């Protein structure tokens, strides 16, 4: 790994420099840096009942009035040729997508040959277009049958279920796929009840205990998948995608700085400590013990996790958070959500210096620099930006979408990444979220992220026509120029 980092840094230095910042800034991105875009299966594919696909847990969720479900989504399943042609026109070096677990294993146990066919075709078309496939094994989509049978991730049997999926993919695509993402945002899976598949009536300490059991099983499964991946595909690179939210102390009060640190420990560091070091941090163990959350840790399991760290860390970056200390002299459970205050530790507050998106997400491009630096300095692994984007209401005017707000967001974040490369941080690539408009988990088609507009809304499928947004042409130019103007 040290050799990789040294070679990477030397390549950066040789690329040419300019000096418009406090450090020497590179002119262009490295030749092997991958400019990509990302989607996930359940949000983009559609074809929910075709080719033997089984029921996934998100399909049991009660439909919200005015928000579409995932049954058709962007209908990528039936627009494959057109969508790959658009990727090629955009100039992508890489495309990150996920596998629908229930296409491959409809009941979680039995392989479905028809389910592979879509991915066979997609991967072949990507390779023909000189686009590197980046495959996410598990992105929120979990077989309902496994939850019904024994609680899914709450049972240790779930580890073998995941490994069956992973092994089938490694064997099938071992000559075609080099880059693998083992799991997407595990922290979100265990904190959002419908992504874990348990009853929404379970709450408080009972839910926290369940979440920790599931989290433990996922970490074992991911470690074993790392081992299998290297055994089946010796040249492969595999790692998880996490969602860091770097914390800014709201004031110069040292208590706020400590609270900000503790927010990050509970947000993502506890999970990366498990992935990369095979251990629970003292802070996290004390946090659980104070809340009477009992962990039954098996020494052999921890040895497996420690022996099989990832090759890289995927970073899904969207926002920072601003933190003040919460001085209440009591302990409470934070509830079932990803972003919430924690009584006795911290509160999340608005930052007057940081703009917010339509959905109240802080827009802080410097946060991606903080994430890259903190993660590398703590874990010393190469990184890939696996998601980054702006969700917004997009309007079609005279057949065009002028999404300058998205261009500004992406430009600021890519500029920060360019600075990080100049500082020598090993970043493999960047995948914007998203390639194409897709169904957002809570806002449906109201919240759009894509470079490509899909002509549908929450109530009307319309014609699902693809329309290139202004940001499409902007990103196309960024890629062709290797980011020279960023």
Protein language model regions, located:
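Low-complexity, intrinsically disordered or signal/transmembrane-proximal segments
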Residues: 9-11
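Active-site-adjacent substrate/metal-binding segments within catalytic domains
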Residues: 45-119
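Active-site region of glycoside hydrolase catalytic domains
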Residues: 20-64, 108-109, 117-486
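Acidic, Ala/Val/Gly-enriched low-complexity intrinsically disordered segments
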Residues: 2-5
